[in-house]
Amino acid sequence: MAKAIFITATGTDIGKTYVSGLIAKHMKDKGLNIGYYKAALSGSLDITDSDAWYVKQQADLLDSYDEMVSYTYKHAYSPHLAAQIEGNPPDIKVIKNAYENINKKHDYMIVEGSGGIICPIRYDNNQKIFLEDIIKELNIPSLIIADAGLGTINSAVLTIEYMRSKNLKVNGVILNRFEMANEMHDDNKKMIEEMTGVKIIGIVIDGILKLDEKNIETLFE
């Protein structure tokens, strides 16, 4: 089985897919066999305009789109609502089986979530699935993507503490849109670490991922 990490974020449009692509490319460039999987994806009229396709192109991944994504919805809503409207609800068994199949082909796996950590994937009378259920079913640790700017202390600490309350392992945080010599960004980094005990294992500056190389291996454990 591949070593895997679940990538979530402090909210929508924080840069989760963007950073997933940077991590995948970073590892691919190092000669590591990296794969990508996303259980449910919404707001995609065409696969070439999807999160998974972006990561696939960024890191030159060879897996097919169907291997990388189990459920794709056209409506740009939370997956649970898009699934209700389009009549194709996710099933946790299908998700686990699809993940295990692509997992076998790689040494490392990135599993990307949808939106923030409290995101309903399915919510109906038959089954209720949240991101935390997928993480537990796949039994993998998580990485949180957060914005470097104003308000991130609150959103990052709340995300970490919520995940801890659900007994989910958090292996680190990456700050996106970080600016050097920005005292607020520097302080945000320090405060998140001090308030939670979770390390900021990387930052993204002008589209460049700054990642401590010694963290890349432990990130997936």
Curated annotation (Swiss-Prot):
Top class in the EC scheme: ligase
Localization in the cell: Cytoplasm
Listed pathway(s): Cofactor biosynthesis; biotin biosynthesis; biotin from 7,8-diaminononanoate: step 1/2
Biological process according to GO: biotin biosynthetic process
Chain sites annotated for binding Mg(2+): 17, 51, 112
Binding site for substrate: 42
Recorded coiled-coil stretches: none
Cofactor: Mg(2+)
Catalytic activity: (7R,8S)-7,8-diammoniononanoate + CO2 + ATP = (4R,5S)-dethiobiotin + ADP + phosphate + 3 H(+)
Positions bound to ATP: 13-18, 51, 112-115, 176-177
UniProtKB keywords: ATP-binding, Biotin biosynthesis, Cytoplasm, Ligase, Magnesium, Metal-binding, Nucleotide-binding
Principal localisation: cytoplasm
Family: Belongs to the dethiobiotin synthetase family.
Subunit structure: Homodimer.
HAMAP family: BioD (MF_00336)
Function, in words: Catalyzes a mechanistically unusual reaction, the ATP-dependent insertion of CO2 between the N7 and N8 nitrogen atoms of 7,8-diaminopelargonic acid (DAPA, also called 7,8-diammoniononanoate) to form a ureido ring.
Full protein name: ATP-dependent dethiobiotin synthetase BioD
Species of the source: Brachyspira hyodysenteriae (strain ATCC 49526 / WA1)
